[in-house]
Amino acid sequence: VYIASPYKVLAVRESQRKAQAISIAQQECLKIMRECEGFTPVSPILQFSYLDENKHRDKALQMGLELLKACDYIYLSKHKDAKYSQGMQEELALAKKLGIKELVLELPL
C-alpha cells in the first residue's frame, strides 16, 4: 500500500516541515499495519527521508512515483492539511490512471 501523505503543504515552520511530515507518514504506516493485516505500507517520505528537500525534491518526487507504480493500493492520509496537497492529488491521479485501487479505511471516530 502506497502511503500518500502531505509534505510541502504542511502548515508548520519550514524548519519543522520534514520532521512533521515524517511523523505523519509513520502514523499512517502504523495505521495500515494495524488495520490491514497482510498489507505492507510504503511511504516515499520515509523511504527517501535521507534526501535534501531543497536539492533533491524533483528526484524524490520522481522516485516516489516509481514506488507508486509497484503498489497494488494507494492510501491517502487523513491529516488536516492533506486535502490541500497538490502532490497527493497528483499521486492519486497517477494511481487511477494505472488502475491502482484507493484503500479507504472506515474507522470509528
Name each model-derived stretch.
Residues 1-109:
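Catalytic phosphate/metal-binding cores of nucleic-acid and nucleotide-processing enzymes, i.e., regions
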